[in-house]
């Protein structure tokens, strides 16, 4: 009924505009008298002056839109009357049906509700239920909702501006932070790589010598504990000393000699513990970056460009287990089972 009233309002407004433009009354346009008078005038002008219909309409001072409204108004009013009658009849039928079915009570089973009080009465449908049945329908509905067909220009501009503002507000800070993070990582890695290239490296054997000394010390230790060795020495009347010997210190005549001999014994020899690695510049004056071969895996790893050859050199070849065939595996299982069976029989015979 609301749609019919809307159409009636649009029809009245259109007919009123045509009446104001031509001078005819609304009743004459609705009855068709205005259309008949205009048709007679157009026919006479076209016959006398030899003009076409469109030229005749322009000659009498009408516009095509007003002529279309005046000529089509009687038919439109008749169709609207039929539509209004149909809508009125449908509304009456709906009213009768509402009155008839208002007293009818549809019972819902509540047996399961007592067992499960939190059970939902309606079926659960997810948000993308219709999009699963009809792919793309959600996007279409959102587009229709955001764009108004009557004012598509302002709504389109509003939607585009809101999307652009969301990009500026959400995406640009995230992309900026990611780019800053990547730039910082590249800068730190490049600085560390250049520091390692420019640093003077020295080959030091001190850790190796220290581990060798520990190995020699533990290899010379007796398997018997020192307390047991002292007990045996006291019982046998022997004198055993653990650690350093102080014979040269015991034979000193003065405290100064004891101090000098102790310092001489405890002082480590002044031995050079490493050799400097010589750095070579790029040949031919190219001023390119150079690095020793043993440093290449480290530098390439910092820049993230380790080749497969360097990976194989660093990690070693991949050792894959040999796959046994089905027959050999069954044979192995059979051999182990038979060995277990013989072992059981042998134990059984030994008990008997």
Swiss-Prot record:
Give GO terms: molecular function aspect only: channel activity; DNA binding; structural molecule activity
The transmembrane segments are 290-310
Q: Cite the positions of N-myristoyl glycine lipidation.
A: 2
Where are the compositionally biased (Polar residues) regions?
326-338
Stretches for region D1? 273-308
Bias type Basic residues, positions: 340-352
| Keyword Cell cycle recorded | no
- GO terms of biological process kind: monoatomic ion transmembrane transport; symbiont entry into host cell via permeabilization of host membrane; viral penetration into host nucleus; virion attachment to host cell
Q: Where is this region: Disordered?
A: 313-352
Q: Where is this region: DNA-binding?
A: 313-352
InterPro entries, per the entry: Polyoma_coat_VP2 (IPR001070)
User: What happens when you mutate residue 296 to E?
Assistant: Partial loss of interaction with VP1
Q: GO cellular component terms?
A: host cell; host cell endoplasmic reticulum membrane; host cell nucleus; membrane; viral capsid
Q: Which UniProt keywords apply?
A: Capsid protein, DNA-binding, Host endoplasmic reticulum, Host membrane, Host nucleus, Host-virus interaction, Ion channel, Ion transport, Late protein, Lipoprotein, Membrane, Myristate, Transmembrane, Transmembrane helix, Transport, Viral attachment to host cell, Viral ion channel, Viral penetration into host cytoplasm, Viral penetration into host nucleus, Viral penetration via permeabilization of host membrane, Viral release from host cell, Virion, Virus entry into host cell
Extent of motif Nuclear localization signal: 316-324
Write down the superkingdom of origin.
Answer: Viruses
What is stated about domains?
The D1 region of isoform VP2 and isoform VP3 is necessary and sufficient to direct the interaction with VP1. The basic-rich C-terminal region of isoforms VP2 and VP3 is sufficient for DNA-binding and may cause compaction of the DNA.
Give the record's family classification: Belongs to the polyomaviruses capsid protein VP2 family.
Spell out the protein name for this chain.
Answer: Minor capsid protein VP2
Species lineage = Viruses, Monodnaviria, Shotokuvirae, Cossaviricota, Papovaviricetes
